[in-house]
Amino acid sequence: MIYFVGAGSGAPDLITVRGARLLSEADVIVYAGSLVNPALLDYKKDGCEVYNSAKMTLEEVIAVMAPAAKAGKTVVRLHTGDPCVYGAHREQMDELDRLGLAYEVCPGVSSFCGAAAALKAEYTLPNVSQSVILTRMEGRTPVPEKEQIESFAAHGATMVIFLSAGQLARLSERLIAGGYAPDTPAAIVDKATWPDEKVVRTTVADLAEAGAREGITKTALITVGGFLGTEYERSKLYDPTFTTEFREASR
């Protein structure tokens, strides 16, 4: 059996209990060495084969996993964060489907959740934003025309922008062109939940300056929106005047 396992956002103790168990049972581990914390390999058992996929192609990854699975071995494909967000695991699953090999997915803590924890922030504040947009700037991987930064910025919702720390000046321009005010709160979270995590609070207009000042060029998330401000409405969930399935309004 092959298991796609989310490694979590960085700190090794943020992997799920299931993920840690699967790592400890694996006969073969193929991990994304460019981003996964190597401390997670401490979970492996003696004799486990370990492959760093940082320099491997899709075909080479499959060439490791498929024969092992066919031989009855337990294989873990360890991805950073949660595999469903920029994890490139769909193409691997399609290849396994083609080969008739079984697999399961074990979710992980995405870096956008780790960033919120680092910021001590809530993305969905009442009367501020009830939506979170996860997106990226185009690079070597293009972005569909209908998913341009300006289009998303027009909503004024909370935005979390991946894989774009090297384009902060252009990102700032496009966010403002889309509708965010230049003084909209923003933050850069570098290596969320890692020991050397760095949080830089700034504004949309000053993203590039803040990134340059701190020497941030990659492995960072950019968060944008009023959720980083100080004003919001109290949640109805714990309001004494609000009746729920479990509690009658007290006044």
Spans of features found by a protein language model:
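Short secondary-structure transition/capping segments
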Residues: 43-44, 63-64, 116-120, 136-137, ...
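Class I SAM-dependent methyltransferase SAM-binding "motif I" and its flanking Rossmann-like core
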Residues: 82-155, 198-201
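Class I S-adenosyl-L-methionine
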Residues: 1-109, 208, 220
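Flexible, active-site-adjacent loop/turn segments at secondary-structure boundaries
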Residues: 12-13, 38, 83-84, 107, ...
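A contiguous loop/helix-start segment that scaffolds small-molecule binding in enzyme catalytic cores
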Residues: 2, 60, 71-75, 131, ...
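Short secondary-structure boundary/capping segments
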Residues: 20, 42, 67, 124-125, ...
